[in-house]
Swiss-Prot record:
Protein's name in the database: Sodium-dependent phosphate transport protein 2A
Keywords of this entry: Cell membrane, Disulfide bond, Glycoprotein, Ion transport, Membrane, Phosphoprotein, Sodium, Sodium transport, Symport, Transmembrane, Transmembrane helix, Transport
KW Glycoprotein (keyword) present: yes
Activity regulation (UniProt): Transport activity is significantly increased in response to dietary phosphate deprivation.
Residues bearing PTM Phosphothreonine: T506, T621
Effect of C597S: Reduced protein expression and transport activity
Family designation: Belongs to the SLC34A transporter family.
Effect the entry attributes to changing C361S: No effect on protein expression and transport activity
Transmembrane segments: 104-125, 146-163, 217-236, 346-368, 411-434, 465-485, 512-532, 538-559
Residue numbers bearing the Phosphoserine modification: S14, S34, S605, S623
Gene Ontology molecular functions: identical protein binding; PDZ domain binding; protein-containing complex binding; sodium:phosphate symporter activity
The organism of origin for this protein: Rattus norvegicus
GO biological process: arsenate ion transmembrane transport; bone remodeling; calcium ion homeostasis; cellular response to metal ion; cellular response to parathyroid hormone stimulus; cellular response to phosphate starvation; cellular response to staurosporine; dentinogenesis
Lineage start: Eukaryota, Metazoa, Chordata, Craniata, Vertebrata
Topological domains annotated Cytoplasmic: 1-103, 164-216, 369-410, 486-511, 560-637
Amino acid sequence: MMSYSERLGGPAVSPLPVRGRHMVHGAAFAYVPSPQVLHRIPGTTTYAISSLSPVALTEHSCPYGEVLECHDPLPAKLAQEEEQKPEPRLSQKLAQVGTKLLKVPLMLGFLYLFVCSLDVLSSAFQLAGGKVAGDIFKDNAILSNPVAGLVVGILVTVLVQSSSTSTSIIVSMVSSGLLEVSSAIPIIMGSNIGTSVTNTIVALMQAGDRTDFRRAFAGATVHDCFNWLSVLVLLPLEAATGYLHHVTGLVVASFNIRGGRDAPDLLKVITEPFTKLIIQLDKSVITSIAVGDESLRNHSLIRIWCQPETKEASTSMSRVEAIGSLANTTMEKCNHIFVDTGLPDLAVGLILLAGSLVVLCTCLILLVKMLNSLLKGQVANVIQKVINTDFPAPFTWVTGYFAMVVGASMTFVVQSSSVFTSAITPLIGLGVISIERAYPLTLGSNIGTTTTAILAALASPREKLSSSFQIALCHFFFNISGILLWYPLPCTRLPIRMAKALGKRTAKYRWFAVLYLLVCFLLLPSLVFGISMAGWQAMVGVGTPFGALLAFVVLVNVLQSRSPGHLPKWLQTWDFLPRWMHSLQPLDGLITRATLCYARPEPRSPQLPPRVFLEELPPATPSPRLALPAHHNATRL
């Protein structure tokens, strides 16, 4: 009896990968049939297998035209291929176009709320920990220690959620003479690290999809990796040679610098009318506490009385007349939600923190869903090609530097690197922007945020203008030096490889992202700060063995992956150590059991195979039953 494929004249091999809960052992087809169709075809047998995700199979020359395919029961894509849908009517087409056009203003509205929620989030952190940040800055004996100064910069920037605020405080302390330029440089480095926590938090909102989360977390942590690597090289160099102090001193001495105005409000012109209705802060309280003015110790950060908006005085008005006019100006009550509540700063800060996080998460989720629906098919391909395509040869190398200029310009417009990097993080998660393109954009954002400190320094008194401008330039040259270290040559772009490794780890163990945030921005800085307070002897005694152990582990890992033959047999893997010392699997089991204790028990289902990730698949070995490499029999969850 002739089989179905023989009656058709032979099998037609389909190059498409198939998804699976059924195993097809029989002839291949020109299209992908469903299980119901296969059951009606004589000579074709299906076997149920446990599989939850696609397994891409390459074509193999099998005898009798037999191939192996796996697919889901009645997936939507296969159903569309089996039955041809009628052409949509004109009214349906118009409805689809109208829906897409309506999504654009909605998306812009959610983006506006997203940026406003970041501003309110910064205000919430300042209310909750602003005075603590001022107290930390006040102790000059601590700040004279470079390592302690670095940690102070990290913690203060995490507390106030704004590197612009922390660097402006540092510039104010330098201009008032309370802090030397050499002592302020490590704090500037720490503020650069602390500002990257915002977009890492934003990346957590895409944890629902492992692939999107892997890309988004890698795109967010590439900023962290760049800052940490730059500090590991430049902080010891600065402590030993004073490189940044001397270079910026020469630059300041060679220019005739005059005072200017504060940073221009570009994006705030749009966001402030809304955020001022929620909360208004008197940020001079934090700066006054930092410079040692105890008169404002018990003063609330919440602004109660505001000066009415008036037209700017003419430039011909004398200084005495201007001061007199300000003295005679009547103050009026501010117009925001918390002006008459009488709540303490901490309570208002916690309320705003919870509310801004809810709005932030909601806007981000809706933005991602709308971008997913808009960026489909040819539209997504065009955008990806435009953003990720390099310039034609021989100007390919210019593409990254052009992206830096774009990132710096956009950050100058929004006056916040956190806003810019948080805005591109969802696009990285969706795959619209590649990590290789996001890296120079982030570096440009690092440069763009230094303009805030430079413009704040230009507003300093004339007698302290040079020192204030010098510390602002230290911020600029620190980022330029980091770019020269970790960007020009492809082999030096370690932050990209480190970020991708972190992304893969968090895609496998999603709780690792929260652990990363706690360790890198809270526990590790606090531990280093405590050790540094015990003196340089304790710092050297603890830091030297730890640094040597870390260097040894990194070296062995590199040799294990590239040339294991150069290592002793027992050191070619970490299996000689207890499992918890070289794998997160035991901790993952504990966390899984702890979370399942609070979950409602579900009906028991057949046991699924363990999660296997592509990068952890064993070397290909022949399968005795199918005569195919083992990779093609694995199921990736």
